[in-house]
């Protein structure tokens, strides 16, 4: 074996050969979809070069020798953000020190302008433009319907002692946040600067207000979820609401490195970009997984790409990092400004699963995100550009009403803060796995207008039930330390608005399912070191490992896992199914619906080649939905639906 210095020299000397002699086929394999498409333009591209494990120093030297300016080093993913000319791309990506290349993609927030009043239900595929007049005085309801529908009208915790790292456009230092913005750093323009809190766009301020803006109905117009929570503001979006993936990764790395200093418990990511590669190689997903392994609960928006230009419901529109297995991926629901859940619907724009390439079931759950009032940044671009979305309170204070999975993500971050305080009070750790499991298990399944339960690709396990989740974690018996012992015993129901709602009692995780009363037991699956993609959990049985030939679970004769899977009478998975390329799921597990929320008659959904460029939206006249055989895929352009404004 060559000594390290000799190997470095060999690597450097070999680069000149690599530049001219890259194997096109293998180099193409190392490029994500965005880079492959970008090559056609012939323009230089911002790239994240991913070094092989242990090759970081070699990669850095190689780039220095070639005179490449490294815009950002990303140690959590072994990445180097650089700009490469079109002719250099394949050579660098093919270099032996690199595992692959990803585009340093533009990330954007996942909010969309609210254009209709929540009390109105437009006809299918239609949007009614009923935005109130600019600065119309908003009459607040006697009780916050947001808190009411979450079951939080009389909750004991407010998120005290919990810190949320808000990775967004910033936070306007409104009195609503008091002295609870503990630190603020700006990651835009390739630098990290400590600054006074600010927000020149306005998106982050709105999300922060939903999480923990201390506003009460007697002196303002809305109520947040966790009024005592602290913030660390990490600005990655500029005044136009755009940022770079590398800046988001640096902010995540900062949160991990400073977790103890700022006591960071939660990261809120109400932003993303289209999925261009499998989760295992996606730099943004890998950074999220690092944060989760560090014990930080990462709450991520699913995206606003759930409907096509013509109003047809589309699937596989989840954005990155919403495809991160450990992330709490949140879709949006419309709670119709009522407390009860019977009229709640999945917001039409909310992105649906499965995730591109991997076929993960996302979102994990949905939460109110439609037409929500929150703090405004008066000097921000949103406030200035969309005056029709301003609402003036009786006190004369202006705020904004926005919609999107950005908003629902903020709501869930607030709920997680409440759970975190509750578990701190009980002296046990709320791990990312346990947080997701509790929220999924206690979620209340939503139904469409016809009374049909939405399938998991649209709502995960259902609408977040803060009261149920809080009740569950506060009733855990912390004296139970032995694995497999029951640590709680309670009825799986929650009363909201004087009505009783059953919990989902399901946990859908990647391509695995937890079913039954598993959450009631102190199990290793809730620990930090468990990667759910490798495990199957069903009822009271746990079998670890990747070998499908040796896994059998359940007490019923009709459940067997081997080379072939027979799941009840409804689903058959055999050797002909290749995850990541073709997937067939029976309709009793996933009920696909068309644009009119009608269930398809066919027994399955088929996904074609997931490496293709596009999504083929559902056809009302077809018996199934097929993705991936055509070049006419549209990545969730809802500009037409929103009157030409596009998504935020």
Regions found by a protein language model. Give the residues of each.
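C-terminal subdomain of the subtilisin-like protease fold in secreted/lumenal serine endopeptidases
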Residues: 35-37, 223, 264-270, 367, ...
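Acidic-leg catalytic submotif of subtilisin-like serine proteases
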Residues: 145-193, 200, 205-206, 210, ...
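Short acidic, glycine-rich surface-loop motifs adjacent to enzyme active sites
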Residues: 252-278, 301-302
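Extracellular S/T/G-rich loop segment that most often corresponds to the catalytic His/Ser-adjacent loop
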Residues: 168, 318-413, 417, 468, ...
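Bacterial N-terminal signal peptides that target proteins for export
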Residues: 1-11
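Bacterial N-terminal signal peptides
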Residues: 10-20
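Subtilisin-like serine protease catalytic core
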Residues: 69, 150-185, 191-246, 260-266, ...
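Autoinhibitory propeptides
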Residues: 29-37, 53-143, 153, 325
């Amino acid at each position: 074996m060559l000594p390290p210095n000799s190997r470095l020299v060999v690597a450097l000397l070999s680069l000149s050969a690599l530049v001219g002699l890259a194997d096109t086929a293998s180099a193409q394999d190392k490029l994500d979809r965005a880079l492959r498409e970008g090559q056609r333009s012939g323009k230089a591209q911002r790239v994240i070069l991913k070094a092989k494990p242990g090759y970081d120093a070699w990669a850095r030297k190689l780039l220095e020798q070639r005179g490449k300016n490294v815009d950002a080093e990303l140690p959590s993913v072994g990445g180097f953000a650089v700009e490469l000319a079109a002719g250099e791309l394949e050579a660098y990506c093919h270099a032996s020190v690199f595992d692959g290349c990803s585009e340093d993609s533009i990330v954007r927030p996942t909010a969309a302008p609210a254009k209709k009043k929540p009390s109105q239900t437009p006809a299918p595929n239609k949007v009614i433009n009923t935005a109130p007049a600019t600065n119309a005085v908003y009459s607040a309801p006697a009780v916050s319907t947001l808190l009411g529908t979450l079951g939080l009208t009389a909750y004991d915790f407010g998120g005290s002692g919990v810190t949320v790292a808000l990775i967004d456009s910033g936070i306007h230092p409104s009195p609503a946040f008091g002295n609870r913005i503990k630190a603020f750093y700006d990651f835009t323009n390739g630098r990290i600067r400590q600054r006074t809190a600010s927000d020149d766009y306005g998106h982050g301020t709105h999300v922060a207000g939903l999480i923990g803006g201390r506003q009460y109905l007697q002196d303002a117009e809305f109520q947040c979820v966790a009024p005592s929570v602290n913030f660390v503001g990490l600005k990655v979006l500029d005044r136009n609401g755009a940022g770079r993936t590398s800046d988001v990764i640096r902010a995540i790395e900062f949160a991990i490195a400073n977790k103890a200093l700022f006591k960071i418990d939660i990261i809120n990511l109400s932003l993303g970009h289209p999925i261009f590669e499998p989760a295992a190689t996606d730099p943004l997903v890998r950074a999220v997984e690092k944060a989760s392994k560090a014990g930080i609960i990462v709450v991520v928006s699913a995206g606003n790409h759930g409907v096509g230009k013509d109003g047809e419901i589309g699937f596989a529109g989840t954005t990155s990092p919403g495809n991160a297995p450990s992330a709490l991926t949140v879709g949006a629901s419309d709670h119709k400004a009522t407390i009860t859940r019977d009229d709640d619907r999945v917001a039409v724009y909310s992105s649906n699963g499965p995730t591109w390439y991997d076929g993960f079931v996302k979102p994990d759950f949905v939460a109110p995100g439609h037409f929500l009032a929150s703090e405004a940044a008066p000097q921000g671009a949103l406030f200035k550009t969309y005056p029709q979305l301003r609402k003036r309170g009786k006190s004369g204070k202006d705020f904004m009403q926005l919609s999107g999975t950005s908003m629902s993500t903020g709501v869930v971050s607030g709920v997680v803060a409440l759970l975190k305080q509750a578990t701190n009070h009980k002296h046990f750790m709320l791990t990312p796995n346990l947080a997701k499991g509790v929220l999924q298990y206690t979620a209340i399944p939503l139904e469409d207008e016809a009374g049909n339960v939405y399938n998991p690709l649209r709502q995960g396990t259902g609408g977040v039930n803060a009261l149920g989740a809080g009740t569950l974690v506060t009733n855990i018996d912390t004296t139970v330390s032995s694995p497999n012992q029951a640590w709680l015993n309670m009825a799986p129901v929650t009363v909201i608005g004087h009505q009783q709602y059953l919990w989902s009692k399901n946990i859908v995780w990647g391509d695995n399912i937890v079913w039954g009363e598993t959450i009631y037991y102190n199990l290793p699956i809730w620990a930090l070191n468990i990667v759910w993609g490798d495990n199957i959990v069903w009822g009271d049985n746990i079998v670890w490992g990747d070998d499908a030939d040796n896994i059998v679970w359940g007490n019923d004769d009709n459940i067997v896992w081997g080379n072939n899977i027979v799941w009840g009478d409804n689903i058959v998975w055999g050797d002909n199914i290749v995850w990541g390329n073709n997937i067939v799921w029976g309709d009793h597990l996933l009920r696909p619906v068309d644009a009119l929320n009608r269930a398809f008659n066919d027994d399955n959904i088929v996904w074609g080649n997931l490496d293709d460029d596009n999504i083929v939206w559902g056809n009302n006249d077809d018996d199934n939905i097929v993705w991936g055989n055509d070049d006419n895929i549209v990545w969730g352009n809802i500009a037409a639906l929103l009157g030409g404004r596009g998504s935020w």
